[in-house]
Amino acid sequence: ALTVETKKRPIGSKPXALRRVGFILNXAPY
């Protein structure tokens, strides 16, 4: 799931923020 989010959104822009969004979408407890 994380790979899909990475491909969908440019990590170079804001990793952090993208990581948070990815975790939330995955459903992770973050």
From Swiss-Prot:
Gene symbol of the encoding locus: rplY
A cellular component term, taken from the record's GO annotations: ribosome
Molecular function terms from GO: rRNA binding
Record function comment: This is one of the proteins that binds to the 5S RNA in the ribosome where it forms part of the central protuberance.
Superkingdom of source: Bacteria
Keyword terms, alphabetized: Ribonucleoprotein, Ribosomal protein, RNA-binding, rRNA-binding
Subunit structure: Part of the 50S ribosomal subunit; part of the 5S rRNA/L5/L18/L25 subcomplex. Contacts the 5S rRNA. Binds to the 5S rRNA independently of L5 and L18.
Similarity comment: family membership: Belongs to the bacterial ribosomal protein bL25 family.
Protein name, entry field: Large ribosomal subunit protein bL25
